[in-house]
């Protein structure tokens, strides 16, 4: 008799019985049904749980001779010793990269094979690593578990929080070797270095013009495609640049809204004498008009021309890249401590408090102080007893949505904080920090 084979619908692997297939499918779904009663960790296999439970037993017979850490498994001790010796015995045959653990090599190999076994059940997107899937799923749930203690801003990834914290600390670890300018992000340094190298990596497939900045490239491509993604909510006009939309919206502020049969005219057509011209609007808004990109031989800007364009119309700050608004340097509100730029002076004043330590908003009940009024108002809820965020599962209520989000994990079992060393997962960031000390 032929042996019946059970096939996985995700990766087409076959198995001799249904139970083994079910066990295998958990590698795709991430399901971990075997939970430790001592801590929050859970496992795909019962055997993994049994091994894990030993870590809660005091007996750790396998001791490290370098640092005296103890382990309940010899294999764990061997893995740990490699952190002292630097040994990486598991080598990728494709790129020769080495790893201390076999499981890390297995995950790395997916980069070469293209295997993405971890699938989102909401949008069918697939990922190489389970941690990437967990991060992606937060785009659906809105969960932002990594919260800044200075300003309460929250993030999907720990790496994003770490970059954000540099705004408060002023740390700029990425230094340009050409001009000694420093940056808080490596990607920002890479883009800055193009001002020295003249590199223009963004090339238009329609006319072969090339650009140093991705934003300039995107805006240019719209001259070919006709795309106008920035739409006015007042009259349905659309523009290829956000700055043009902002300028157009000022025409609604300066005159009553009227229904017009010519609503679909472009902004360039609006510049007739009956309305303000583009130059007048730029002047009234304190903005500098964005010129046409200069023509040059081979349809690529000369180094001098692009240098002039980028220096005068794309000042080096997150401002132009993020908002698409081009401000001349004299119009910017710039922090003297970290070079961050702001559209409004009031925003700069608030930001500078992260450097000076000034906290002008004081609670009249407990004398606690805050950088921003909104933080004081949120704090006052503690004294007022206002807890507007209520758990639908158990009725417990909280002052902040972020606190409710953490609490909900006690019901859902979600553990978004993942240890990069061993894959252990936690429901709270503080628990991950404590755990990481064992590594």
UniProtKB/Swiss-Prot annotation:
Chain segments carrying region Disordered: 246-275, 285-304
Mind telling me which GO cellular component terms the entry cites?
Answer: nucleus
Q: Check the record and name the Pfam families matching this protein.
A: zf-C2H2, zf-C2H2_6
* Disulphide bridges: none
Q: Which domain of life is it from?
A: Eukaryota
**Cellular location of this protein?**
Nucleus
* Zn finger spans (C2H2-type): 6-28, 34-56, 62-84, 90-112, 118-140, 146-168, 174-196, 202-224, 230-252, 333-355, 361-383, 389-411, 417-439
Output the GO biological process annotations, alphabetical, semicolon-separated.
Answer: regulation of transcription by RNA polymerase II
Q: Which GO terms describe its molecular function?
A: DNA-binding transcription activator activity, RNA polymerase II-specific; RNA polymerase II cis-regulatory region sequence-specific DNA binding; zinc ion binding
Q: What is its main location?
A: nucleus
Write the record's keywords in alphabetical order, separated by commas.
DNA-binding, Metal-binding, Nucleus, Repeat, Transcription, Transcription regulation, Zinc, Zinc-finger
**Which family, according to the similarity comment?**
Belongs to the krueppel C2H2-type zinc-finger protein family.
Q: Name the PANTHER family for this protein.
A: PROTEIN ESCARGOT, ZINC FINGER PROTEIN
Function of the molecule: May be involved in transcriptional regulation.
Q: What is this protein called?
A: Oocyte zinc finger protein XlCOF28
Query: What is the phylogenetic placement of the source species in the record?
Result: Eukaryota, Metazoa, Chordata, Craniata, Vertebrata
């Amino acid at each position: 008799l032929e042996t019946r084979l059970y096939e996985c619908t995700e990766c087409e692997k076959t198995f001799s019985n249904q139970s083994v297939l079910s066990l295998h499918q958990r590698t795709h779904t991430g399901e971990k049904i075997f939970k430790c009663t001592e801590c929050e960790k859970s496992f795909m296999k019962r055997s993994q749980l049994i091994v894990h439970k030993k870590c809660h037993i005091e007996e750790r017979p396998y001791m490290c001779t370098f640092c005296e850490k103890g382990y309940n498994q010899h294999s764990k001790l061997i893995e740990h010793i490699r952190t002292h010796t630097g040994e990486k015995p598991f080598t990728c045959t494709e790129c020769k990269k080495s790893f201390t653990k076999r499981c890390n090599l297995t995950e790395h190999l997916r980069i070469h094979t293209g295997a993405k076994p971890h699938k989102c059940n909401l949008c069918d997107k697939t990922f190489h690593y389970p941690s990437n899937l967990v991060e992606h799923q937060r785009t659906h749930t809105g969960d932002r578990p990594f919260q800044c203690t200075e300003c309460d801003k929250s993030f999907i990834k720990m790496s994003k929080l770490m970059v954000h914290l540099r705004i408060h600390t002023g740390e700029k670890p990425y230094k340009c070797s050409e001009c000694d300018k420093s940056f808080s992000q490596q990607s920002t340094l890479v883009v800055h270095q193009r001002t020295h190298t003249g590199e223009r990596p963004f090339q238009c497939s329609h006319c072969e013009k090339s650009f140093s900045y991705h934003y300039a490239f995107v805006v240019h491509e719209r001259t070919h495609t006709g795309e106008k993604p920035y739409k006015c909510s007042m009259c349905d006009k659309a523009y290829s640049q956000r700055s043009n939309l902002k300028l157009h919206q000022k025409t609604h502020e300066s005159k009553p809204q009227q229904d017009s049969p010519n609503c679909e005219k472009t902004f360039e057509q609006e510049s007739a004498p009956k309305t303000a011209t583009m130059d007048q609007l730029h002047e009234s808004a304190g903005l500098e008009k964005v010129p046409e990109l200069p023509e040059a031989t081979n349809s690529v800007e000369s180094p001098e021309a692009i240098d002039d364009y980028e220096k005068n119309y794309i000042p080096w700050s997150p401002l132009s890249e993020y908002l698409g608004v081009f401000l001349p340097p004299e119009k910017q509100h710039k922090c003297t401590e970290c070079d961050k730029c702001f559209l409004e002076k009031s925003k700069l004043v608030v930001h500078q408090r992260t450097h000076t330590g000034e906290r002008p908003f004081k609670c009249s009940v407990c004398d606690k102080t805050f950088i921003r009024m909104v933080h004081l108002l949120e704090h006052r809820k503690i004294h007022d007893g206002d807890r507007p965020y209520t758990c639908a599962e158990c009725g417990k209520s909280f002052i902040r949505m972020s606190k409710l989000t953490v609490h909900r994990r006690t019901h859902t079992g979600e553990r978004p904080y993942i240890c990069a060393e061993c894959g252990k997962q936690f429901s709270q960031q503080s628990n991950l920090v404590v755990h990481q000390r064992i590594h």
